[in-house]
């Protein structure tokens, strides 16, 4: 006990010595007292972002999506200005200049690029045809300028894809919204009708529709829209089933909001992200399907053209004049690839669960 008391007294002495040393080492004059003016101090606030601003920020971080977006913009610009910057019309024929290879000034001096105007045998095809003007993408078997026809075809393919997607959005959103909002027997009947339509092969429906009516761009668009809206309707129906029992919808319903107001003011705006993403995947699907129809010979009628029609025309000349197939096929492939890259980036930006 005596030993413990001695230890305690020693510890107390050390503590008192430390406190004395600390108080002597730090004087009050070492501190500077300043008055704080809250009105002049900068406020540290985080910039608030809404849903669309946050989605745009996420999209910009996705490098592949940015590449797809830039590529799409470039192709769309060339689709509209490409036929204009060339003096040749897309339907103009000159059989004396048929099957000429691509020749682009300046680039024809680069040895490894296929823009020197020489044929498969290494001969100057322009000199043999006595052609004094350059055809940037060459000519086809009828002597039509492939530069103008390629970008005119891209323009028509984009038109078909975008308009078909808009029709799919309109029909699918209306059908899916009604089915998902009302539910019950209405939903059951509408879904059975949808299953019957979906059981019919899409290709057979489109081919029969195109063969019965006069072939045209609008015939192809309407034919693709017969069954193209089914996927959109399922997406919208699922969103409505998820949102119609949410608190903000039930609160508006309790306050006496009409069904029209509930659908178009409260529920539908909250499904726009799913609609945008689905529609962005619909456009390349429609472009590819139109190219397939043109490839089997029931696409856009002559003299109009599309990328699919150009690929079909160039297929017969593949072994002799490969540029007639490779150039439109490359533009078509890049167009669909850029659409899918951009669409995939949109899906990741709109869906927080997909973000890394």
Language-model segments: what does each one mean?
Residues 2-169, 173, 317-320, 324-338, ...:
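Gly/Trp-centered helix-boundary motif
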Residues 139-356:
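Alpha-helical transmembrane segments of integral membrane proteins
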